[in-house]
Amino acid sequence: MKKVVIRECPDYTPDHVKTTLKESLEALGGLEKWIKPGDLVFLKVNLLTGKEPKEAVTTHPQLVKALTELLMELGALVILGDSPAGPFLQGRMRKIYQLTGMTTVAKETGASLNWNLESDPVYFSAGYRLKDFHVMKAIKEADHIINVSKMKTHSMTMMTGAVKNMFGIMPGLKKAELHFRFTDPIEFGHAMVDICEYASPVISIMDGIEAMEGAGPSAGDVVKNGMILVSEDPYSLDIVASEHMGIKPDSVPTLKAARQRNLCQSLEKVTLDTSLGEGIKKSFKLPDTREPDFLEKYGRWPVVGSIFKQISRKHLRPKPVVNPKKCTKCKECYTICPAEAIDMLEKVPGFRYDKCIRCYCCQEVCPEKAIWIYRPKILKWFGGTK
């Protein structure tokens, strides 16, 4: 059975974070179980976009600093990095490192920031959907990867945690291409699992001290959550996190895909080492992107199901909408859209919904939270959503 450790940590006070993180890791055998002096360790943090730590969009720098210090105490060499949404360019990375606090972490600890923006093609024979793809060159050069994710809801995948965090080893706009290639959520989930399996992080850590609910992964609301989660198995870690957030594992494409491949166990088969006295359950507000599930109810009647499917795709699917009062015409959404379904109409984004693949990358990268998801109220009448 896989083990997941949860420890309470009320805030980002340095002593609280470092002590809690060290205790969590010791419950799994300590960092020395995986790391030796001289090892080059890549900390794959979540740096989705250039947001300050208080917005809970990215892995908090205090957790990254504590982990870096623990690694350096063992004699490891540490490099911090991610390939955020959008172009993978030095100027963009400099801004993101500064805003997210990673520049400060590097200065205070002596860790390196990843400035190697090159990528290498890899062949992964065990991939279910992905065998040939590109990864950051810095990932290949590291001895070990440690996965340092953020607990958040996600408009496309319901939650983003340890497994999806590894998507960031794929450089820049290559990620957008993958969205367009795998428009079905479960197929996309398999691709995420392929990348996670290739990366094989030695340990996965989740920043759940402050989390995000609602319109995640970037436009949601901050939740004071007070916990750090650690596991050697990213799938078990995500299962526990999904249970805590009130999300059914099978509604998370990465977990459903992992289950289909026998990589993921049920919560009952996870060994849970927790300091929480009242259990782990807590319901998060979920994204408004859930699609109607009544097709499954009527699926036994092909003709009826076909009619409902056509109606659903045209009239009942959630869709991104722009708030013109918040939009600054920065064109981030236009640049990122993998389906090229956005036009700049008088410099304000306009959506061609017949082309939109509902990946919600546009909402994800919008710096002003100007894109929201419209979800027809009539969906509630059908008694359920995915």
Describe these PLM feature segments.
Residues 357-358:
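Extended, alpha-helix-rich binding/interface surfaces that flank or overlap catalytic cores
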